[in-house]
Design a protein with these regions (language model features):
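Anionic coordination/interaction segments
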Residues: 1-362, 376-389, 440-445, 525, ...
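Short, well-structured beta-strand segments within conserved domains
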Residues: 751, 792-804
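Extended, well-ordered alpha-helical scaffold segments
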Residues: 287-297, 301, 305, 329, ...
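Short strand-turn-strand beta-turns centered on an Asx-Gly dipeptide
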Residues: 778-781
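Carbohydrate-binding/catalytic loop surfaces
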Residues: 349-358, 399-426, 458-464, 483-505, ...
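Aromatic-rich carbohydrate-recognition surfaces in CAZymes
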Residues: 71, 359-364, 368-379, 383-483, ...
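Catalytic cores of carbohydrate-active enzymes
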Residues: 151, 165-166, 397-398, 513-630, ...
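Surface beta-strand/loop "capping" patches
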Residues: 730-761
């Protein structure tokens, strides 16, 4: 069953049935002002932080309410409906709707009772407020007299928990006032005399606004209970039923913004208005409203600027292959998903309510990888930020606050950091993600000078990027377990594996090995011969250790417990086969050809399903060791033998590196949202964004996916597809092209911007192989192999690669 389709030309997903199996969401805005909106207009808004900047209220995992609601009432028949199917929820036999989710905007189209409406929700580019632009058309043969009512429900405090939990405080600090064409919602209004920097108990007066432009306000209400009415709901508010709002203002309890306008429409006539929401004081709110004297012209200009901004970002890399599902994800939706995780980390969604008030170190450093080929300048800014969140001992701050102050932060060694963030210890993998991310940025941009840039540490001191990386490596060297492998510490990517100071992680050992390979390249560039020799020697010793300790006949084990027990050996009754060590043995370059083939074949036989490969098998139940916290989850769920989607990207990359194009593409299709559009009732999540995990074969809901949008899956799958399947592998000197594709692909093309040049790449596959290069031509000149030195590139470079 499907609920919509992809419009690739407009870069939209069009929902044609509003009764989706879950709220299907989109992101609006920027790091300064963010918003989520569902296909039924549910969602919330926030300034900078989903935890401490909440503006519009949302009740999580309930009924996708409240939201950005626009009600339409026929004043003759007294019938009313909403511009989105919900909250009124008219019978779908008579109410027709479409939701168009695009790049940072969402449009709702509705037809009911001879009235056509179209509302576009967006945050203007470089602005910190949102717009609900409404067009109403009379499609009937007679004049229509309508009342249009917009409704926004404000939080009583910027802090999500204070608004939702601490009601004995937050219910008694708010008020609303009506000002010409808007309602102003005030928190701590009794402190209106207090200046910034002179807060009372860290509190200042704060104003939000909800405004109407394009028509005069006919009636208004600023009190939630008065608008809805007792024992009424969002589907039947008394203010809408009555056709006139009460004029009641909030003083304590719950404020809202409700504004109504009269609209008289002749047959065929269209009128436009806009509702505006933001967190602004009186003067700034008034100035914003004045911009919309001509609603149609202003909104059209803003939407054009917004789509132009995102189209320009996405156009840096476009593919045309025989697979529409692949093209849809790589060209638009996987790319846009990468940007959203890059911006918001794991801070705000319909699953993350905003309580993680900052960036997870490992999450964000990995998220950067997904946008490097599209926006290297944005990636650079975030890499600098994350390097400045590295502690001088080489470890990363597990949580990097949105208010991060480099050089002055506490660390997990300080009780104050633990108390403030809830993160009690370092994680084994955090700083190791810097190596591939920094390498990928420099390889894509050619900015080798970055390696010498001086960046502060989180707590004290500063050093070059090169030194930052050396200290990241030293952190692992200084935290080895009894066998000489890296200790698992508080977690090692898998937050449900607590291996501690003496338990050891094969996954981190493989990351550590890979980090040495990358750092050797930087050491060579720096002509740091002594350090290169050190790395060569240590990497050889580490490789021998991993092979001797972790290779178990046909698989790599997962590690060792603090008691020295092996995790993931063939004879274990539970969790005897793990996914990540197999893929990372290939990615790191440690596995021999024979090991790689055996391990990956084992993955295909033991772990793979029609929805992707499960994280491990069998699930924990009776035989979990003390640190195997996955046992708290139901079998087939999350880390306990669920299909953890981020790992699918590494699996795609590993198979591609082995030249297994058919298998790499199979793994892509098993987990790709676009490939499951016709199974939406099973997957449940949006068919245009990735989720954190899918329930595995041990679950009665096998195939159901969870935790949308904000997941490392977006970046790992993007890297797996771009570097793996498509074979775009830049290095310091140029670009290697090594596709690993389905054998039945005849050819594909890529449009790629690279270091100020545009590459038009055609890959031909006349012999229908999965990998391999017969010849590479650059501007009709034959290259020695499948590598393009950057000096061979021109402003418009024509590339032709023939596979064989």
């Amino acid at each position: 069953m499907n609920f919509g389709y992809f419009d690739d030309e407009k870069r939209e997903y069009v929902i044609t049935r509003p009764d989706t199996p879950a709220p299907w969401a989109n992101y609006l805005g920027s790091p300064e002002y963010g918003a989520l909106i569902s296909n039924n207009a549910g969602g919330y808004s926030f300034a900078r932080s989903g935890a401490n900047g909440r503006i519009l209220r949302y009740i999580f995992n309930q009924f996708d309410q409240p939201g950005r609601y626009i009600y339409l009432r026929d004043n003759e028949s007294k019938d009313y409906w909403s511009a989105s199917w919900q909250p009124v929820g008219k019978d779908l036999e008579s109410y027709k709707s479409e939701c168009h989710h695009g790049t940072a905007y969402t449009k709702m189209l509705a037809d009911y009772s001879g009235i056509h409406s179209e509302v576009c929700y967006y945050v203007p580019l470089n602005q910190t407020y949102e717009v609900w632009h409404l067009k109403v058309t009379n499609a009937s043969a007679c004049e229509r007299n309508l009342t249009i009512t917009g409704y926004a429900e404000f939080t009583n405090n910027n802090n999500y928990e204070q608004d939702q939990v601490n009601l004995q405080y937050s219910q008694f600090i708010t008020s609303t006032v009506f000002e010409t064409n808007r309602i102003r919602h005030i928190i701590h209004g009794n402190l209106d005399w207090v200046k910034e920097g002179e807060e009372v108990d860290n509190k200042l007066a704060i104003s939000r606004f909800f405004a109407l432009t394009g028509a005069p306000v006919d009636s208004y209400c600023g009190d939630k209970e008065s608008f809805l009415g007792r024992y009424h709901g969002y589907h039947n508010p008394v203010g809408v039923e009555n056709g006139k709002l009460s004029g009641e203002m909030c003083y304590n309890e719950n404020g809202c913004g409700a504004l109504a306008a009269q609209m008289l429409l002749k047959p065929g006539e269209t009128k436009e208005i806009a509702f505006l929401v933001g967190m602004k004081e009186h003067e700034e709110a008034e100035a914003i409203c004045n911009r919309y004297a001509d609603v149609a012209a202003q909104c059209e200009t803003e939407l054009k600027e917004l789509t132009g901004y995102w189209y320009e970002k996405l156009e840096h890399f476009q593919v045309h292959t025989p697979s529409r599902e692949f093209d849809t994800m790589i060209n638009t939706w996987n790319a846009y998903n990468c940007f959203m995780t890059f911006i918001w980390s794991r801070a705000a969604s319909f699953f993350y309510c905003g309580l993680r008030n900052g960036y997870g170190y490992r999450d964000t450093v990995q998220d950067i990888q997904g946008v490097i080929h599209l926006a290297p300048e944005m990636a650079l800014e975030k890499i600098r930020f994350m390097l400045s969140a590295q502690v001088d001992n080489g470890g990363g701050l597990p949580l990097v606050k949105f208010t991060h102050n480099a050089g002055h932060e506490d660390t997990p060694d300080d009780a104050s950091y633990v108390q403030e963030t809830g993160h009690p210890a370092y994680r084994a993998d955090d700083a190791l993600w810097l190596f591939p991310t920094v390498y990928k940025y420099i390889a894509e941009s050619g900015n080798l000078a970055f390696i010498d840039e001086v960046i502060p540490f989180a707590n004290k001191d500063e050093a070059t990027v090169y030194e930052h990386l050396k200290r990241a490596l030293a952190f692992s060297v200084n935290h080895l377990g009894p066998h000489g492998l890296p200790a698992g510490l508080y977690a090692d990517w898998n937050d449900c594996l607590r291996l501690g100071k003496n338990g050891e992680s094969s996954f981190v050992a493989l990351q550590f090995y890979y980090a040495m390979t990358i750092l050797k390249q930087f050491a060579a560039y720096k002509e740091d011969r002594a350090y290169m020799d050190y790395l060569e020697e240590e990497q050889e010793k580490l490789g021998t250790l991993i092979n001797n300790l972790c290779w178990n006949e046909d698989r790599f084990i997962r590690g060792f417990t603090e008691a020295g027990e092996v995790i993931g050996k063939r004879t274990d009754p539970e969790a005897n086969m793990w996914l990540n060590p197999q893929s990372w043995a290939v990615i790191s370059g440690l596995a021999t050809k024979q090991q790689a083939e055996l391990a990956m074949e084992n993955v295909r036989k033991r772990l793979n399903t029609e929805y992707g490969a499960i994280l491990m098998d069998p699930p924990y139940h009776l035989h979990a060791f003390d640190g195997a916290l996955a046992v708290i989850y139901n079998p087939g769920t999350k880390e306990n033998a669920g299909i953890f989607s981020q790992s699918q990207g590494w699996l795609i990359l590993a198979e591609a590196l082995l030249g297994h194009g058919d298998q790499a593409f199979t793994y892509f299709m098993e987990n790709a949202p676009s490939a499951q559009n016709d199974r939406a009732e099973i997957r449940k999540l949006e068919p245009y964004c990735y989720g954190q995990f899918t329930e595995g074969k041990d679950s009665p809901h096998f195939g159901r996916s969870h935790v949308h949008w904000l997941t490392g899956t977006a970046s790992t799958v993007m890297v797996g597809c771009v570097e793996g399947i498509l074979g775009m592998r830049p290095d310091f000197g140029g670009l290697r092209i090594a596709p690993s594709i389905p054998a039945d692909w005849d050819q594909f093309t890529i449009e790629k911007d690279f270091r100020g040049k545009h590459l038009h790449i055609v890959v031909e596959n006349p012999e229908h192989v999965q990998s391999g290069c017969k010849a590479l031509y650059v501007n009709e000149e034959k290259m020695e192999d499948n590598y393009i030195p950057v000096e061979k590139m021109t402003d418009q470079t024509k590339v032709r690669l023939v596979m064989a």
